[in-house]
C-alpha cells in the first residue's frame, strides 16, 4: 500500500509540473506540412530529427521561438494541436530560461491539427500572430 501511495504521489507531482496549457503549436514551413498531410505523417524538421523529438511551443512561448529560430522567414504555418491528444509521447521539458517546452517523442498525425494558420511576415522580419491564441 505504501508503494502504491508513493507512486501516486510521484505521478501527481509530475502532472503538477506540466503547464495547464492544452493547446500547443508547431511552426512549420508550408511545403513540409503539405507533404505531411499527403503522407499522413509529420516526422519533424531537421532540427527535430537532430534533437530526437518534435519541438512545440505554448502560445506564450511563440514570440520567442519565432524570433530565435524563424526571424525573416516567410511561408510558415502555425499548427495548433491539443496537447491531450498526443498522449504519453508528449513530454514537458525545461529549455531556454528553465521554461517547460512541449516535446513530442514520436510522429505527429496531421489529422491531430486543430487549425493550420499561415503566419504573416511583417516588413520588420517579425511574424504577426493570430489574436485568438490560447
What are the residue ranges of the model-derived segments?
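N-terminal amphipathic/basic-hydrophobic helices that include classical n-h-c signal peptides
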Residues: 1-19
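Conserved, structured core segments of small domains
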Residues: 14-134
Amino acid at each position: 500500500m505504501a508503494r502504491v501511495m508513493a507512486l501516486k504521489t510521484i505521478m501527481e507531482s509530475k502532472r503538477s509540473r506540466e503547464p495547464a496549457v492544452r493547446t500547443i503549436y508547431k511552426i512549420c514551413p508550408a511545403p513540409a506540412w503539405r507533404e505531411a498531410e499527403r503522407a499522413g505523417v509529420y516526422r519533424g524538421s531537421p532540427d527535430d530529427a537532430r534533437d530526437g523529438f518534435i519541438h512545440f511551443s505554448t502560445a506564450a512561448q511563440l514570440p520567442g521561438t519565432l524570433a530565435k529560430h524563424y526571424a525573416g522567414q516567410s511561408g510558415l504555418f502555425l499548427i495548433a494541436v491539443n496537447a491531450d491528444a498526443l498522449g504519453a509521447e508528449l513530454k514537458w521539458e525545461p529549455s531556454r530560461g528553465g521554461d517547460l517546452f512541449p516535446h513530442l517523442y514520436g510522429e505527429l498525425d496531421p489529422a491531430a491539427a486543430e487549425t493550420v494558420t499561415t503566419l504573416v511576415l511583417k516588413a520588420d522580419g517579425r511574424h504577426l500572430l493570430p489574436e485568438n491564441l490560447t
